[in-house]
């Protein structure tokens, strides 16, 4: 199992590079974490205290997943030797689908680039 600092880097830091597989699997995990409270919300009676609790948990999960998706995309763009600011394109409807496919399908730069020596590790200062 990865160390806690590795998971913190993967989901919350923007330095370094990630591979296509790490980007896709990290994004899938974020989506599952985000979907769970939404699923639980649909199972409880509308307007109940439990409903309010699950909607609040979903809101927190959504905010955390938003940042996690940005951090993953920035590191994936770094692997393609592109600036992280380009990740903002993921907020444009329709274009975001194409951008997601590009990030999942295009191979990263082999060897070192200006964002890190190797894929799937933080950049060294």
Predicted segments, located by residue:
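Membrane-interface extramembranous regions at the lipid-water interface
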Residues: 1-29, 69-85, 102-125
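Membrane-helix interface segments in multi-pass membrane proteins
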Residues: 31-66, 71, 84-90, 96, ...
